[in-house]
Amino acid sequence: MAERNYTVVTEFFLTAFTEHLQWRVPLFLIFLSFYLATMLGNTGMILLIRGDRRLHTPMYFFLSHLSLVDICYSSAIIPQMLAVLWEHGTTISQARCAAQFFLFTFFASIDCYLLAIMAYDRYTAVCQPLLYVTIITEKARWGLVTGAYVAGFFSAFVRTVTAFTLSFCGNNEINFIFCDLPPLLKLSCGDSYTQEVVIIVFALFVMPACILVILVSYLFIIVAILQIHSAGGRAKTFSTCASHLTAVALFFGTLIFMYLRDNTGQSSEGDRVVSVLYTVVTPMLNPLIYSLRNKEVKEATRKALSKSKPARRP
């Protein structure tokens, strides 16, 4: 039996959206504006939380870390995407591809854990208000956030090592916006069963574990809200959770679509659109989501803007 000759791949060629030549410049400008809005919005949120003493609470402590992670999350993906559009496709070494995949997985995992932690924080505030300050102490806050970073690192390390023990050969074109595991598996020339199991484990344990914490927390919150007699009290309590629920639905909805389904075949246009939602749009919208429905954030923003205005001369 004749042996098949394979060309070993040591670098990849990212080509997402480059087939639409007429959209290259508009897409570049759109993604660049989204990235700048993400950086401005999330940096502004962090500075606002640190600068206003009224926002020095556990909820905003977790939100500031979510904003920090969103900045890093976007920065790991969007600059490379802009290079792909500007250069009409770009070459990336296997080492850089592995680094990008690690950073994406690291920050995406932390996002999952932080959203679950924020749901638990809301549950404690609504359902156990008298014990809130004794449960969510400063030590507990730092412990939860540190745990999210450590768990995110472990998840990213395992997935990256597992993915890049594969042999890649033949076609080196990745028709996707960044180095993600599903498109990489399509380029492997060996048995990728172990790597596919890792995808399933991540999809069936990490995300659902976070979602379970969120669902259980909000189940208790809904029960507590229904027991409030005044309509105004119910509305006020629910409004403190509505922003978080919106962010959860947007983030987990797109991730579930990407990972809890069949990944065979070539990356479709729909895959790339969904990947743009969770890597570009969601980090940009988070500061807006938490600002529009949050009275404390709006008041802090107005206060900061009033301070920045030059004083009028008499």
From Swiss-Prot:
The chain crosses the membrane at residues 26-46, 55-75, 100-120, 140-160, 198-217, 238-258, 272-292. GO terms for biological process: G protein-coupled receptor signaling pathway; sensory perception of smell. Keywords: Cell membrane, Disulfide bond, G-protein coupled receptor, Glycoprotein, Membrane, Olfaction, Receptor, Sensory transduction, Transducer, Transmembrane, Transmembrane helix. Glycans are attached at N5. One of its GO terms (molecular function) is G protein-coupled receptor activity. Disulfide bonds join C97-C189. Coiled coil: none annotated. It is found in: Cell membrane. Residues 1-25, 76-99, 161-197, 259-271 are extracellular. One of its GO terms (cellular component) is plasma membrane. It is a multi-pass membrane protein. Pfam families: 7tm_4. Its main location: membrane. InterPro entries: GPCR_Rhodpsn (IPR000276), GPCR_Rhodpsn_7TM (IPR017452), Olfact_rcpt (IPR000725). Residues 47-54, 121-139, 218-237, 293-314 are cytoplasmic. It comes from the Eukaryota. Belongs to the G-protein coupled receptor 1 family. Odorant receptor. This is Olfactory receptor 9Q2. It comes from Homo sapiens.
